[in-house]
Structures are given as structure tokens and as C-alpha cells.
Regions:
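Structural signature of FAD isoalloxazine-binding scaffolds in flavoprotein oxidoreductases
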Residues: 54, 61-66, 91-112, 166-196, ...
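Flexible, small-/acidic-enriched active-site or ligand-binding loops
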Residues: 202-208
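Charged/polar low-complexity intrinsically disordered segments
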Residues: 5-7, 12-18, 23
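Anion-binding (especially nucleotide phosphate/pyrophosphate-binding) glycine-rich loop
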Residues: 27-161
């Protein structure tokens, strides 16, 4: 949720530095049959990143819904887990990524019409609810269609909303943490939580969550 009234400075993330011999998939991931979404094994990740580089993921999962993600969290055990959005500003090693990669690119793109309200001062405000898979450019344009101001500086930020919140993305003096009202996430146990803005700590290109981990 956002309260509303270009160049991106993302640090690049490097993945897949460690490598070891993968176990047979049926032994490592015996629970995959519980997933409703698409599952790809030993999938090359280059096509899923903006700079088109990267080796294979042991397992690449496209969850159909939140329940799929909960299933992953409850069954993955000690397997590493990485959440992939639009794949912007991301460097994946040619050796690939061991463990599980979950792509949110094709899901969680719901975006609601603004909910308008008036503050005690009489000023008119609006709240927009959007999924983690919504592109930042689309979110900014969606707000503009309703003559809302507050996130227009973020229109040029690459990537999706979920990643932007995790990194407290910003441009031209505006950061996502300045307009964020609340965030709904899954904690490491797969439980749904909603955190208000004042429960989060925003730093330069970083958002600190109370429990340290979670999936937006």
C-alpha cells in the first residue's frame, strides 16, 4: 500500500558464487509434486535477467499463487532459496544457482484503483494496493492516470515493486520508503504478516524487516 500526494542507483547483486555437486532432484526436492505452478529443472537463468547472463538453477519455480510459495517455505528444509523478480541489475554466475529459485515475474501483478480519503487537515490523499510483481514503471503511470503525485520520480526504475521495497529503491530524491504505507509478506514459516511503515527501517538502498527475512 502506498500513500501518494531517472536514473536508478541499484547496487548489483552477484549470485551463484558457490558450487557443489547437486543431488538427484527426486532426492533433494521430493515435495515438488505439491506445487501447482510450473517447475523447470536445471533451467538456464540468462533469459530471466535483464543483461542475459547466468547459468542453471537446480529448480526454477513459477508459483501459481501464495499457497505455492507457502508450500515451498514449509518443505524446502536447508535448501537455499532465492526470489527472482524482473531480474534487473542482477549478475548470475555462469555456474548457476544451487537450490531453489522462485520467479514472481508472471504472477502477483494485481493493482487496485486508488482509495481516496481526507486527512484531518482536509488534504486529499489516496492509497494504492499493488502486488509484488507489478513493474515500477507501470505503478507510477497507474498513479498518474488518477492525477496522483508522490511516485512519479520512480517511473524510470527498472524491476518490480517487491524488489524495489526490499532495496528501498529511489531516484531524483524520492525513495519507496517515503510513500510506502504497509507491506504484506510471508515470514520464513510461511505465515502471512502485514507490517506498517513504522515497523520497518529504511536505509540507503536497503529496507530492514523486523524478523530479518520474508517474501513480499
Amino acid at each position: 500500500e502506498f500513500n501518494l500526494k531517472t536514473r536508478m542507483e541499484y547496487p548489483k547483486t552477484v549470485l551463484g558464487q558457490k558450487i557443489h555437486q547437486s543431488k538427484t532432484m527426486s532426492h533433494s526436492f521430493p515435495w515438488l509434486h505439491k506445487i501447482k505452478g510450473n517447475i523447470l529443472k536445471n533451467e538456464i537463468l540468462a533469459p530471466y535477467t535483464s543483461i542475459q547472463i547466468g547459468g542453471p538453477a537446480d529448480v526454477l519455480i513459477f508459483p501459481e499463487d501464495v499457497r505455492d510459495i507457502q508450500t515451498i517455505l514449509k518443505n524446502k528444509g536447508s535448501q537455499p532459496l532465492f526470489i527472482l523478480g524482473e531480474g534487473t541489475n542482477l549478475l548470475v554466475s555462469d555456474r548457476g544457482i544451487r537450490g531453489i529459485v522462485v520467479s514472481l515475474k508472471d504472477q502477483f501483478k494485481d493493482i487496485k484503483r486508488p482509495l481516496f480519503f481526507r486527512k484531518e487537515t482536509g488534504n486529499r490523499r489516496a492509497v494504492i494496493k499493488a502486488g509484488a510483481g507489478v513493474k515500477m514503471s507501470y505503478l507510477a503511470k497507474h498513479a498518474a492516470r488518477y492525477s496522483l503525485t508522490g511516485i512519479e520520480q520512480l517511473v524510470g526504475i527498472p524491476g518490480s515493486l517487491g524488489g524495489a521495497i526490499v532495496m528501498n529503491a529511489g531516484a531524483e530524491g524520492t525513495e519507496i520508503g517515503q510513500v510506502l504505507r504497509s507491506v504484506t509478506l510471508l515470514n520464513p514459516d510461511g505465515e502471512i504478516q502485514t507490517l506498517k511503515r513504522d515497523e520497518l527501517t529504511f536505509e540507503y538502498r536497503k529496507t530492514i524487516f523486523p524478523n530479518g527475512e520474508g517474501i513480499i
